[in-house]
Regions:
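Conserved ABC ATPase signature
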Residues: 170-174, 178
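A short, proline-enriched helix->beta-strand linker immediately N-terminal to the Walker B motif
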Residues: 189-193
Length: 356
């Protein structure tokens, strides 16, 4: 199979109306859902089938870290396994790198997984009888690459995750965090465009988890990987994700930036999820500022000497600036032009969660 052809503007991943119903009567249940609008409890009662995911749709652009989160049983792990067809959907369309995943032959699907898709699980399933070097190079061995090539790539990937010097160790000689890094290096070895990560750091201690999050974010940016990252930890999703999808009972209930999710929850379920999350690092000046024309029309204040701050300045930084001046803060665009104003009243409303 030749490499999928895409432009930089095309979505790397597209899901459109994807359903998964588990059970012997899944097709019959699917027809009933479509024709009668049955819900998850009715499907279980009438057909003895379980709705895993329900009408999931989203797109992921190139280079984005798209986090999917929800409680246990919400369908997030089931959903991510549809992207490489470890699980077959009952209905819907799945496109990855411009290829219709459901139309691929067995050989094409194996090539797609081996070359273009990398997956990292919570439990790495490293081969215990192989060294770290050979574990990392295993995907290349499956592709038939010679040992010299495998070792060269393994060395490079181990350096990326700061494990150079551990090439000849065995998994049992490594800590849990180090084993996770071996798993990430293994996923990177085939240089896939897409990474599918299913709670890869959730079993680790908080300090190690944070270190691996930092390392992963840096690698993702440097290598321009497109990632679907599954987690049950909202703090992790907010820290890592460019956008977040929240799932409940197999459905996606909201998709948005971390700021959107925290400040504009779609329903009570999302609101309960984000309760207690600090907004100080998630809400930015452009979201709460008063537009410059509107401010000048109502306030006769000379802003020429006011402190300037970029539109991407977060609440925490705005608070620091406010403590150093009695004047409003003028917000600027990417070119340095004045576009808005934040006074102390506006800042307090932003901290409380309101808009100017």
């Amino acid at each position: 199979m030749s490499s999928p052809s895409q432009t930089a503007e095309d979505p790397v991943i597209e899901l459109d109306g994807v359903w998964k119903i588990f059970g012997d009567r899944a097709d019959e249940a699917m027809r009933a859902v479509q024709n009668e609008g049955l819900g998850k409890p009715e499907v279980l009662e009438k057909f003895a089938c379980v709705v895993g995911i329900a009408d999931c749709s989203f797109t992921v652009p190139r280079g984005e870290i798209f986090c999917v989160m929800g409680l246990s049983g919400s369908g997030k792990s089931t959903m991510v396994r549809h992207l490489n067809r470890l699980i077959e959907p009952t209905a819907g369309r799945i496109s990855v790198l411009g290829r219709d995943m459901l139309s691929l032959s067995g050989e094409e699907l194996r090539t797609m997984r081996a070359v273009h898709l990398g997956m990292v699980f919570q439990h790495m399933a490293l081969l215990p009888h192989r060294t770290v070097r050979d574990n990392v190079g295993f995907p290349l061995q499956v592709r038939g690459e010679p040992k010299s090539k495998r070792w060269e790539v393994s060395q490079h990937c181990l350096e990326l995750v700061n494990l150079d010097g551990y090439e000849d160790r065995f998994p049992r000689e490594l800590s849990g965090g180090m084993q996770q890094r071996v798993g990430l290096a293994r996923a990177l070895a085939s240089d896939p465009e897409v990474l599918l990560m299913d709670e890869p750091f959730s079993a680790l201690d908080p300090l190690i988890r944070r270190q691996l999050q930092d390392q992963f974010m840096a690698l993702s940016a440097d290598l321009n990987k497109t990632t679907v990252f599954i987690t049950h930890d909202l703090d992790e999703a907010i820290r890592i994700g460019n956008r977040i999808a929240i799932m409940k009972d197999g459905r996606i209930v909201q998709i948005g930036t971390p700021e959107d999710i925290v400040t504009k929850p779609a329903d009570d379920y999302v609101r309960d999820f984000v309760e207690g999350i600090s907004k100080l690092k998630l809400v930015f000046a452009h979201s709460i500022m008063i537009p410059l024309d509107q401010y000048q029309a109502s306030q006769k204040i000379d802003l020429s000497a006011a402190t300037r701050a970029p539109h991407g300045t977060d609440l925490d930084q705005l608070i620091d600036i406010t403590t150093t001046t009695d004047h409003p803060i003028v917000i600027t665009d990417d070119d340095g032009g004045d576009i808005g104003v934040i006074d102390k009243t506006t800042l307090l409303k932003g901290i409380q969660g309101g808009k100017a």
